């Protein structure tokens, strides 16, 4: 199973956002949840003067969290990644996360 990290592209496999994909903004390991860009948006009502970022207050929209078990890591081609390792590609000087896919033999 691939470990989910910030910046990964994931696809939702369960829940009301099933089938949608996005980039991971934050991983909350203690809660077992992830925050995915443009998915599970929630509205928060904020009073005037409560925040330096939004001093006028109002209704804010932000990304909610999704359970880690409800998402899977996908590659650039939107296919699931089964295994990954840290290593060097041929001719590369820096280490990177290399992804492998399990192909079904028929």
From Swiss-Prot:
> GO CC terms on record?
ribonucleoprotein complex; ribosome
User: What's its job?
Assistant: One of two assembly initiator proteins, it binds directly to the 5'-end of the 23S rRNA, where it nucleates assembly of the 50S subunit.
Region Disordered: list its residue ranges.
84-106
Query: Record keywords: Ribonucleoprotein included?
Result: yes
Q: What is this protein called?
A: Large ribosomal subunit protein uL24
Skewed-composition ranges (Basic and acidic residues): 84-97
HAMAP family under this entry? Ribosomal_uL24_B (MF_01326_B)
One GO MF term attached to the UniProt entry? structural constituent of ribosome
Q: Can the keyword ATP-binding be found in this entry's annotation?
A: no
Keywords attached to this Swiss-Prot or TrEMBL record, sorted alphabetically, are: Ribonucleoprotein, Ribosomal protein, RNA-binding, rRNA-binding
SUPFAM superfamilies recorded: Translation proteins SH3-like domain
Which superkingdom is the protein from?
Bacteria
A GO BP annotation: translation
Q: Which residues cross the membrane?
A: none
Q: Which family does it belong to?
A: Belongs to the universal ribosomal protein uL24 family.
Q: How does it assemble?
A: Part of the 50S ribosomal subunit.
Its gene?
rplX
């Amino acid at each position: 199973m691939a470990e989910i990290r910030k910046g990964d592209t994931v696809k939702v496999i369960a829940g009301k956002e099933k089938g949608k994909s996005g980039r991971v903004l934050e991983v909350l390991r203690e809660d077992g949840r992830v925050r995915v860009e443009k998915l599970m948006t929630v509205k928060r009502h904020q009073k005037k003067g409560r925040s330096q970022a939004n001093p006028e207050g109002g209704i804010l929209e932000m990304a909610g969290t999704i359970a880690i078990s409800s998402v899977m890591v996908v590659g650039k081609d939107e296919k699931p990644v089964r295994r990954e390792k840290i290593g060097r590609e041929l001719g590369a000087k820096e280490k990177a996360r290399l992804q492998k896919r399990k192909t079904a033999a028929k």
